[in-house]
């Protein structure tokens, strides 16, 4: 049974992330969406909120589970019995950084393979940071987020993120 880990901060999880999760779930027996605690980032959503939103977003996929972790990805991957790390690539610039991380992960955990998945062209421009920025200015981000996540964004930024005009 091949287990894969798909790591990220997922603040919030987007439809681009979901595309990777759904496709990885078709390849691997089990996919663990690993929500990382990154002390260098100031998240919009707490760890518990992110885990909860992701669990709601992936609830229709039977072979996906969601966990949080801190520390080295390879340590988490090894503890989970996973042999693959899934990474989504939006552009060549993503590959530069991801390739270096894959090589380091291989050094630290020789049994692990990094699997790069090209993002669907509909989401090649998309990032959590971009979604948060658009939402912070009252923009409509409804095309980019799973429904449960969109509801949480509306709680933070108001209904304009759903494409609804503010009530006057």
Curated annotation (Swiss-Prot):
Coiled coil: none annotated. Substrate binds at residues 9, 41, 73, 87. One of its GO terms (cellular component) is cytoplasm. It catalyses: (R)-4'-phosphopantetheine + ATP + H(+) = 3'-dephospho-CoA + diphosphate. It comes from the Bacteria. GO terms for molecular function: ATP binding; pantetheine-phosphate adenylyltransferase activity. CDD domains: PPAT (cd02163). Its cofactor is Mg(2+). It is an enzyme of class 2 (transferase). Its main location: cytoplasm. Its EC number is 2.7.7.3. ATP binds at residues 9-10, 17, 88-90, 98, 123-129. Homohexamer. Belongs to the bacterial CoaD family. This is Phosphopantetheine adenylyltransferase. It comes from Heliobacterium modesticaldum (strain ATCC 51547 / Ice1).
């Amino acid at each position: 049974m091949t287990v894969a880990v798909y790591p990220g901060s997922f603040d919030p999880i987007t439809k681009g992330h979901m595309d990777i999760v759904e496709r990885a779930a078709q390849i691997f027996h089990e996919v663990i969406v690993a929500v990382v605690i990154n002390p260098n980032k100031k998240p919009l959503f707490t760890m518990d909120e992110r885990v909860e939103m992701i669990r709601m977003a992936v609830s229709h996929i039977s072979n996906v589970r969601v966990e949080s972790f801190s520390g080295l990805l390879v340590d988490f991957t090894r503890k989970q019995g996973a042999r693959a790390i899934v990474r989504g690539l939006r552009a060549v610039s993503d590959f530069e950084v991801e390739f270096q991380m894959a090589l380091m992960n291989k050094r630290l955990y020789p049994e692990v393979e990094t699997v790069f998945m090209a993002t669907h062209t509909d989401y090649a421009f998309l990032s959590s940071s971009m979604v948060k920025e658009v939402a912070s200015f009252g923009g409509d981000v409804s095309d980019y987020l799973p429904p449960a996540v969109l509801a949480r964004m509306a709680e933070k930024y108001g209904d304009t993120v759903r494409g609804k005009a503010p009530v006057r």
